[in-house]
Structure formats: C-alpha cells, structure tokens
Curated annotation (Swiss-Prot):
It is found in: Cytoplasm. Molecular chaperone; assists the folding of proteins upon ATP hydrolysis. Known to play a role, in vitro, in the folding of actin and tubulin. GO terms for molecular function: ATP binding; ATP hydrolysis activity; ATP-dependent protein folding chaperone; unfolded protein binding. One of its GO terms (biological process) is protein folding. Heterooligomeric complex of about 850 to 900 kDa that forms two stacked rings, 12 to 16 nm in diameter. It holds the Pfam family Cpn60_TCP1. Keywords: ATP-binding, Chaperone, Cytoplasm, Nucleotide-binding. Its main location: cytoplasm. The keyword Cytoplasm applies. This is T-complex protein 1 subunit delta. The keyword Transcription does not apply. Belongs to the TCP-1 chaperonin family. It comes from Eremothecium gossypii (strain ATCC 10895 / CBS 109.51 / FGSC 9923 / NRRL Y-1056) (Yeast).
C-alpha cells in the first residue's frame, strides 16, 4: 500500500499546475501582442478605440492602444507596462517591444515543451539580450547634433507610420528645431516638459507652428477696457483672488439702511484698490491669475481698477500649469498680496493676443533668461479633435526620437535590418556553445525575426521570401539591408534614409527580455483577500 501524502505535499508534488499557469500566462500575453501586431510599420493599420467616456480615438501608437484596452489578465497588463516603459525611455518602438515580447514568449513555450527549466530559459534570454545590445551598438553610426539633416531623417522615419505621414516633411524639421532650441553640444538629455504642445482646432496640420516662448490658451480680459498688448512686460503669477473675501461659514448680513450699504461698498472698493495699488507699486504690468473654485478669481471692480492702472489681466490659469509657467517665465508664484514684490516677477519683451485661424491665443515672446528655463511652444493644428490628438501624439513621438539622439548619439538603419543582423550574429555564436544554452540562443535569434516578418506582412509582401532574401544579403556582409515599403522589397535602408536611434532598439530588446524573465518565473497565481 503506497504511503499517504499530506494535502500540502501533494500540491508541491503536482507538477502539472505550474506548467498550466505558465501556459495560461503565455497565451494571455501573446494575445495582447497579436492584437497590435497589424499596426507595426509604415503600412500598419490604425485602431479605432471607444473609451469608457464614449470618446473616439484613432491611433496606431502601441502604447496609446494598449493603455485604452480593457485588459483584465494580470500578465497581459505586464505587456502594457513594458510598452509604457519603452514610451518613457525611448518614446518610440512601443509596438515593437510588445511584438518582440510576444515572440520571445512563443520561443519560450517551445523550449518549455522540450523540458528545459524556465529559469535557465529566462537567464539565457537575458544574456542573449545583452549580446544583442552589443551587436546593435557595434553596427550603429555616430552622429553630431549639428548634423540637422540626419536628425530630420530620423524624425521622418518615426512619423512615416502615423496618420500624419504625408506631413512628415513639415513636422520632422519642426520637432528637430523644438529640441535643438533647448539643447547644445554638451547636453546629455532634454526635458520634453519644456516643450509645450498647445492644441487648437481649426486650420490644417500645415498650420502647426513653433513659437520661441510661451503660448497661453486663456484670453486677455477685455471687459473692463484694459490693454491687450504689452511691451517690456513684467509678469506676475498670483494664486490669491482679487475679489472681496468671503466668510468661512455661511453667514447672512442684514442691512437696515442705505448708509450701511454704502459703507460695505466703500470697504470693498478700498480693499480692492489697496491690492491693485500694491501690484502696480511692484512695477507689474501683466498679471496671470490662477483659477479659483471658491470665489471669483477677479471681480469686475478689480478689473476696472487694473485697466485704469494699465495692467494686462489673464485669468483662469489652471493649477497644473503654474509650475511650468513659473519655470519658463522666471517668475515665482505669489500666494499672498503682502508677498508681491518686484523680485518675484518675470520679464518678457512682448505679451500680445493674436488671432490665429479664428481662435485667439496669447503669445509671450522674448523671455529674459535670468532664472527662467528656455522653453518653446508648439501650436498644433487640425481639422477636428481626432486628427488633432493623433497629430499631437505623432509629434511627441518625433520629439522623443530626437531626445533619444541627444542621450545616445548614434543611428542605425530601420526596416528590420538591425533585427536580422542581431539574429544572424546570435545564431552564429550559438553554434559554438555547449548544452541547453545553444538551444535557447537559437530560439531567441529566430524570435527576433518577428519584426521584419511583421513589417513585410503588413506591407502586403511575401514575408518568407523577404526574410530569406534579407538573411542571404546579411550573410554576404550587407548589414544595413532591410525592408523598404516604398520599393516593395529589400534594399539598403540606411541609404534610403530609413533611420532610427539605436536607443529605441536596445531599449526594446532589453525590456522584452526582462519582461519574459518576469513572466517565466511565475508558477502560480493566487488572489489576496
């Protein structure tokens, strides 16, 4: 009679469960990768997404699509996080990183079926990923930030897969100029928060323009007849209200005769006039007022006094804009009128309201860089909100590509060329290895071919023929041979100016390998109470 096994021990001996859990995890993650696979490359399709609030989005940006998808499986959510990590690190390649993760999980599934331990697979994948990064850096070409043409080509490649691809010759130089105006040859990074993208419906994408300064969507208050243009501006950014104070509790004041009424109005006038004179005394002539939900940020009487004192008033500045405006205008936010002093003001050559395609915007130009940080604004135009949102996302991707080149000044050919080259190198090196590692590296090498295969499929080409042709061209030493959709076949993509920053590819492979390692190490899912 066999010995009795306790319940906990039986669970430990049951080897089926971890395998089933891993299989379920891999299926869930690959389903996410397959869902966005058709949106890769210049001929990739767009997805229409209806959000929970009923808004419509049209995009082929991997991170945008995944962020909006209702994903319930916890492992599938890890792919959304990988896409988000790629978006914050490189800004581009968000679809590629998810497809690559899906392909590596497919390779891992085959290896698990052969009985190879998941930890060995995960660690071998990471070593292969590190080797892939070395190969990519080896085949990249160094560039200088002075070489504007190369930067424009890299930005154009990023825009080629978007709805706005026909405007890439216009938007790519715009993105390059925005980033270069904030950097110099010694810069190692650029903060994209210093580039303000302002969306305005109206006009076409061609009307998108860059402004060397700050653009505000709020209008100048004209109801009291104050100025709408100010040269040699001294700008104050206030967080207090210029209106009569309200009691903390709900109180009623009973007025018996007109003398008391007159006294209340006199008090109010004196209170507001004192605040306005204090502002004028500090030599402030442009006033930005934060939006208030408790009471009027500025009332009609205060506007009348400010217009008489020749002060431009812009009200309803959002709370989340305060930090940006403070940084870019060089002025400190003022929370109390007693703290309103000249040293807290920012300076600019000109503040004016202009009419742009039927909408009014406020431009602040010629900002004096004392303690101000250099910033640029970009007014994004589009026929409707759907086009406008996608234009903004596309422009952000192009800006991220240039930021990648500021961080790591090296370009590689696009169109699947780096993946084929890395795949070939890893496959060759795996033949010299012993044991299980050789198997794992071979599967890793084959998985990398998913990028050129998908590019060819989405372009309507014969993927088997194209990938086979690329392999033979790389074997004969053409390291930059990739897929050109324009030529409907293989070509030297570097000479065709299909370029991408090396950081996009290195980041994608590293993140994909790390994500696969995390997924393979999970052998059970339990739910907490």
């Amino acid at each position: 009679m066999p010995p009795k096994v306790s319940a906990s021990n039986a669970t430990f001996k049951n080897r089926e469960k971890p395998q089933e859990v891993r299989k379920a995890n891999i299926i869930a993650a690959r389903a996410v990768a397959d869902a966005i696979r058709t949106s890769l490359g210049p001929k990739g399709m767009d997805k229409m997404i209806k959000t929970a609030r009923g808004e419509i989005l049209i995009s082929n940006d991997g991170h945008t699509i995944l962020k909006q998808m209702a994903i319930l499986h916890p492992v599938a959510k890890m792919l959304v996080e990988v896409s988000a990590a790629q978006d914050s690190e490189a800004g581009d390649g968000t679809t590629s990183v998810v497809i690559l993760t899906g392909a590596l999980l497919g390779a891992a599934e085959k290896l698990l079926a052969k009985g190879i331990h998941p930890t060995i697979i995960a660690e071998s994948f990471q070593r292969a990923g590190q080797r892939a990064v070395e190969v990519l850096l080896g085949m990249s070409k160094r560039i200088s930030l002075q070489d504007r043409a190369e930067l424009v080509r890299a930005a154009s490649t990023s825009l080629s897969s978007k709805i706005v691809s026909q405007y890439s010759t216009f938007l790519a130089p715009l993105a390059v100029d925005c980033v270069l105006s904030l950097t110099n040859e010694a810069s190692t990074n650029v903060d994209l928060n210093d580039i303000r993208l302002v969306k305005k419906v109206g006009g076409t994408i061609d009307d998108t323009e860059m402004v060397d300064g700050v653009v505000l969507t709020q209008n100048i208050v004209k109801s009291a007849g104050g100025p709408v243009r100010m040269e040699k501006a001294k700008i104050g950014l206030i967080q207090f209200q210029i209106s009569p104070p309200k009691p903390d509790t709900e109180n009623n004041i009973v007025v018996n005769d007109y003398r008391q009424m007159d006294k209340i109005l006199k008090e109010e006038r004196a209170y507001l006039l004192k605040i306005c004179k204090k502002i004028k005394k500090a030599k402030c002539n442009v006033l930005l007022i934060q939006k208030s939900i408790l009471r009027d940020a500025v009332n009609e009487l205060a506007l009348h006094f400010l217009s008489k004192l020749n002060i431009v008033v812009i009200k309803d500045v959002e709370r989340d804009e305060i930090e940006f405006l403070s940084k870019s205008l060089g002025c400190k936010p003022i929370s109390d009128v007693e703290l309103f002093t000249e040293d807290r003001l920012g300076s600019a050559d000109l503040v004016e309201e202009i009419d742009s395609d039927g909408t009014k915007i406020v431009k602040i130009t010629g900002i004096k860089t004392g303690n101000a940080k250099p910033t640029v604004s970009c007014i994004v135009r589009g026929a409707n909100n759907v086009v406008l949102d996608e234009t903004e996302r596309s422009l952000h991707d192009a800006l991220c590509v240039i930021r990648c080149l500021v961080k790591e000044r090296a370009l590689i050919a696009g169109g699947g060329a780096p993946e084929i080259e890395v795949s070939r190198t890893i496959m060759r090196e795996s033949r010299a290895m012993q044991g299980v590692e050789a198997f794992v590296w071979q599967e890793f090498a084959e998985a990398l071919e998913v990028i050129p295969t998908t590019l060819a499929e989405n372009a309507g080409l014969n993927s088997i023929k194209v990938v086979t042709e690329l392999r033979s061209r790389h074997e004969s030493g053409e390291t930059n041979a990739g897929i050109s959709v324009r030529r409907s076949g293989t070509t030297n993509t570097y000479d065709e100016h299909i370029l991408q920053p090396v950081l996009v590819s290195t980041s994608a492979i590293t993140l994909a390998a790390e994500c696969v390692k995390s997924i393979l190490r999970i052998d059970d899912i339990t739910f907490s109470r």
